């Protein structure tokens, strides 16, 4: 026992001990707080499966599609690696989106955790970029045309747009140079995400985790191990079952059948659809007819998320005690689901109009956030004043009865 304690005092092990074993955690956190560790698990799965897949993948336009088929047919366990990697990306986004909306509901972006939130938004942006360039690598029809459409959006940037597109492509069209660049970046970015995740964790542990009540307490806390560890372990088991259902029974249900057709620059798919986790942002992009306006709207999405901690005016963190904000939060959730549905529909009426209305609704939430905090503060103040008057009236009535 003494030897174990002496080892834990060494610099590297003490850091590990302070952040993952003895880390003081609020005793009332729920299972919603387990999605952070699940996101870390998903990242590890993606990195490990990606490294092994890269050993058999060939980043060349003539061989990329065939190398993926080689992995599926000839590499022992290759089908499992590919399906774990492809479905692992979807699981990663599911977990991160739930983690994100939990933070939004319980006010985890509020002071003093602004840096934690901003790092989380940066990680989300890195995930989207990594997933997009990874989707290009199989070099199927949807991969090729998705890369062509999305990268060409950079041409909307004034003055330097065309230069950026040429630099991204490595030429004047999506070709072998593009595939090589995307493969290199797709291999690199997960490690950058891992580094950003460590910074995210360090920033979180500077002030401690939030809790469902949204209050600060340095007394009512417990060690992460074994209490929170066991709670997270339950979530890991449930996640493993959910993940396994997709990997073993429905591995292609979240993909697109057109991507099993080799890329053909001479044949455009009837409907170019990105992966499901891009659909809300893709719907906002499509809702604006002007290309530059669409790109600006995507940028505004992430600017709004980054600005949220600084435009928040509420003194109460948790939406459990903010009934007005709670309603707007659920409207935002419904709006994001609607945007996701619109993103996979054809660009025609009435989907375009619905997408435009839903896009306005998305940004309306961030526009009204500062007003909600002030309105709720005024309601609380008036409620306290009414309660004080009621107590005073009751007290005076009691005094009068006693005197009588």
Curated annotation (Swiss-Prot):
So where does a ubiquinone get bound?
205
Q: Which InterPro entries match?
A: Cyt_b/b6_C, Cyt_b/b6_C_sf, Cyt_b/b6_N, Cytb/b6-like_sf, Cytochrome_b, Cytochrome_b_C_euk/bac, Cytochrome_b_N_euk/bac, Di-haem_cyt_TM
Which is a GO BP term held by this UniProt record? respiratory electron transport chain
Which sites bind heme b b562? 85, 186
Question: One Pfam family this chain carries?
Answer: Cytochrome_B
- PROSITE patterns in alphabetical order: CYTB_CTER (PS51003), CYTB_NTER (PS51002)
> Which compartment or compartments is the protein found in?
Mitochondrion inner membrane
Q: Which UniProt keywords apply?
A: Electron transport, Heme, Iron, Membrane, Metal-binding, Mitochondrion, Mitochondrion inner membrane, Respiratory chain, Transmembrane, Transmembrane helix, Transport, Ubiquinone
Which positions, given as ranges, span the membrane?
A: 35-55, 79-101, 116-136, 182-202, 228-248, 292-312, 324-344, 351-370
Q: Which SUPFAM superfamilies match?
A: a domain/subunit of cytochrome bc1 complex (Ubiquinol-cytochrome c reductase), Transmembrane di-heme cytochromes
Q: How is the cofactor bound?
A: Binds 2 heme b groups non-covalently.
Q: How does it sit in the membrane?
A: Multi-pass membrane protein
Residues engaged in binding heme b b566: 99, 200
Q: Which GO terms describe its molecular function?
A: metal ion binding; ubiquinol-cytochrome-c reductase activity
Q: What else does the entry mention about this protein?
A: Heme 1 (or BL or b562) is low-potential and absorbs at about 562 nm, and heme 2 (or BH or b566) is high-potential and absorbs at about 566 nm.
Q: How does it assemble?
A: The main subunits of complex b-c1 are: cytochrome b, cytochrome c1 and the Rieske protein.
The entry assigns this protein to a family as follows: Belongs to the cytochrome b family.
Name this protein carries in UniProt: Cytochrome b
């Amino acid at each position: 026992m003494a030897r174990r304690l002496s080892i834990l005092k060494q610099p590297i092990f003490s850091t590990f001990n302070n952040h993952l074993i003895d880390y003081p955690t609020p005793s009332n956190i729920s299972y919603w707080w387990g999605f952070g560790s699940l996101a870390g698990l998903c990242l590890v799965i993606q990195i490990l499966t990606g490294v092994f897949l890269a050993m058999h993948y060939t980043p060349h336009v003539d061989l990329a599609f065939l190398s993926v088929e080689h992995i599926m047919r000839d590499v022992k366990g290759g089908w499992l690696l590919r399906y774990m990697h492809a479905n692992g990306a979807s699981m990663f986004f599911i977990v991160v989106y739930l983690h994100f909306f939990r933070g939004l509901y319980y006010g985890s972006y509020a002071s003093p955790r602004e840096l934690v939130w901003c790092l989380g938004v940066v990680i989300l942006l890195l995930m989207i970029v990594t997933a997009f360039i990874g989707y290009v690598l199989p070099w199927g029809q949807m991969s090729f045309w998705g890369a062509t459409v999305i990268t060409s959006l950079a041409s909307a940037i004034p003055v330097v747009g065309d230069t950026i597109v040429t630099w991204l492509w490595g030429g004047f069209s999506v070709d072998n140079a593009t595939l090589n660049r995307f493969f290199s970046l797709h291999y690199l970015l997960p490690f950058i995400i891992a580094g950003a995740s460590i910074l995210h964790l360090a920033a979180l542990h500077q002030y401690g985790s939030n809790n469902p009540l949204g209050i600060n307490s340095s007394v009512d806390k417990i060690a992460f191990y074994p209490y929170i560890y066991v709670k997270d372990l339950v979530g890991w088991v449930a996640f493993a079952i959910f993940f396994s259902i997709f990997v073993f029974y429905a591995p292609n249900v979240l993909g697109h059948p057109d991507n099993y057709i080799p890329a053909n620059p001479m044949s455009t798919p009837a409907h170019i659809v990105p992966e499901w986790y891009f659909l809300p942002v893709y719907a906002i992009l499509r809702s604006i007819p002007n290309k530059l306006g669409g790109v600006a709207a995507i940028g505004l999405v992430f600017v709004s998320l980054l600005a949220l901690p600084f435009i928040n005016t509420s003194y109460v963190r948790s939406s459990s005690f903010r009934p007005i904000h709670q309603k707007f939060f659920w409207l935002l959730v419904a709006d994001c689901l609607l945007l996701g549905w619109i993103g996979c529909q054809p660009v025609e009426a009435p989907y375009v109009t619905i997408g435009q209305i839903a896009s306005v609704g998305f940004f309306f939430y961030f526009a009204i956030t500062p007003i909600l905090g002030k309105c709720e503060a005024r309601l609380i103040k008036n409620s306290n004043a009414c309660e004080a008057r009621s107590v005073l009236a009751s007290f005076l009535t009691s005094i009068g009865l006693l005197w009588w």
